[in-house]
Curated annotation (Swiss-Prot):
InterPro entries: KATNIP, KATNIP_dom
Name used for this protein in its record: Protein KATNIP homolog
Signal sequence coordinates: none
Start and end residues of each stretch annotated as Disordered: 1-30
Organism: Caenorhabditis elegans
Summary of the knockout phenotype: No obvious phenotype. Ultrastructural analyses reveal disruption of ciliary microtubule load and organization, although various aspects of gross cilium length, function and transport are mostly normal.
Amino acid sequence: MSDSDLKEIEKNAENIKLEPAEDEVNEEDQNEITIPELPEGRVLELRLLSNWGDSHYIGLNSVEIFTSTGERAVIDKVTTNVTEYTGSLESLIVQRVHCKDAEKMWCAKTTEEKIVLTLELKETCKLALIRFWNYNASRVHAQIGVRYLEMYLDGVGIFRGELECAFSADSEFTPVMGETVLFTTSDNILELIALHDVCLISLPEEPISNSSIEMLKADHLTPYRPSTCEAKDAPSTPVTIVPPPIFRQTGTAYKHDVKTLHIELLSNWGMDGLIGLTGLELVDEHSQLIDESQYTVTTSDGNSDLSKKLFNGRNLTRDPHDMWLVDFDSKNFTTISITFHDNVALKAISVWNYNASFELSYAGVKAAKIYINGKLIKNVLLRKATGFVYFDYVQDVVLDPNNTERDFVPKGISQSIGGFVFQIRLLSTWGDEFYIGLNGIELYNRKGELMKIREHNLAAFPESVNILPNIKNDLRTSNNLITQPNDTDIARNMWLTALLPNRCARVFFVFDVQTYISKIVIYNYRKTPERGVRHISVTVDDLIIFSGEIPSSTATLTGNLEINLMDI
């Protein structure tokens, strides 16, 4: 996708979320502001043009200013032209970038007049970097945060642009480092800044696993987190990693004489002119991977170097350089052909759909046909990738030559909502700043029957409190979400995870075939009711189908929310 295409998508998204005010449009029509190299001055003026949608307030958490010497600029005084605001102006310049106390964070009532913050520096200096931490008293009130602003230094414009919302679904995978405006590209100056930047010097230096690096970074930026422990009943119980599902053995689940495998890509998830995959793996009769030395791969585009990316093994990624992406025309189907040097017993194909970003995930394959030795074996509906890597988004396609329609599941007569990925975003708690949890979640099929959810269908991010460096073997892991009892006050039967700055906890139910659900029942956390979930949103394959509030639990009663999808 070209840069112009991405800009068009962003523009359309902005129009849907929030129409700019007239004065914003007029400002954009005025003279452009070019970001200068190391602007010099003493009085920094921040003109707050709009917020992210709140109709009454606009606010900021804090502002960090670094000079050409790498040190923080000393600010003598902060003033504003508005009279109605909460919090103190001094809170904007303290090194407490992740505060979530609404009484301390600065927030002003919107007026017809443009809101201006004036920061007077102790002495004239050259500005190298300014970082903004947007308003984030809670994820529900993130729309109070500044969206468009201008900066003037001694009356000269040095920046006009947009700040990210403090709670942005599209940016949650990115490390939380605030919104940075650079006034230099000098490596020497940036290295000097790094020596004084609390966001960098507080990160751990020892090597850690890729799967936990994002969560550990966020935790090191969090204020003191009170300890929590529920491991005394089983102190030596390790936290086990759930193995991948074992393909069931059936008499017709695979063929022993596979010489050629042909995959015909019929459609994508909506991207115009492109289709792609992150990776493929071939599984034999013993549930072992077939080594790529045993076959050759050709694709209809004829690019052998590009086709190698399909089997490079780097499948849990958002790096487009590790993915396969080609031009697509629905009138001329794209094909992937695999020829085995010797006949093999092929049981399944593991597929990772295209995952470079949320927008580009729509280039992923949607419908495909699978041929073995020239014979149609299966029609496949592939799940769209998520655009992030909160869990292993692999989809296992088990081959059954006696059934070509299994993956095209009809909806049936009863009302229900179908999809591949059901996601529950946990947006806020009933008061706790550090932890969030649930007792359990139940899914009901279109017949109204409780579904048996297996562990490989469940993913949670963060998985549990065990991701924190100081907690090990806590029993409140994510598998408790799908095991009974749910109406309980016994902590080891519950799920608890860490609240990370500017991220929401998420629970995913992921299926390899389109699955229809008629009802979701959520049981709130009971051991410490203020750690229970308050606000949630539910999406099915990226479409929001519900948002609301879960009642708080008490010491004697488990709060629960029943979401009847037949009413939606």
